[in-house]
């Protein structure tokens, strides 16, 4: 990654605190992590809608969606996966600075990468949501047919099958998508946000 000594950071005259005050809530990254098929996208879509309906400034970044544009030049090697998360972390930080409750849904299999995003943000601005679901259940669901392709060898380095997933050890929130409904999971997250005075 090239760096230049000729680049200067320009501060805005509108602060993050001012934006949060105008929005009537704090800003943070609500970072969903979990296996493919665990329900990250499904629950994050429902959460974004609930926050929006409650009048909150919110935006969702989805793993598949960003690979159509921002990260379309990245593959799925360990290095590219890490770069994928690094870029998303930087975008999420900008959105937090803009005062938004930023919902992200990425497998983000490596603990080091997730902690790297946490380190970009101020204290309490990174809310890790572990979307807990067994490989067996994820494979049973297989909404995109990816597990079938991974088992046949069509997709190498597939998280949970032929590539590792490092589950969070101390996430702020764990949702049990194998047993709880979408509504229950969203309710659990909203409750956390209210109890910790984000909203």
From Swiss-Prot:
Keywords: ATP-binding, Kinase, Nucleotide-binding, Phosphoprotein, Transferase. CDD domains: APSK (cd02027). Residues 1-22 are annotated as: Disordered. It catalyses: adenosine 5'-phosphosulfate + ATP = 3'-phosphoadenylyl sulfate + ADP + H(+). Belongs to the APS kinase family. The active site is at residue 108. InterPro entries: APS_kinase (IPR002891), P-loop_NTPase (IPR027417). Its EC number is 2.7.1.25. It is an enzyme of class 2 (transferase). This is Adenylyl-sulfate kinase.
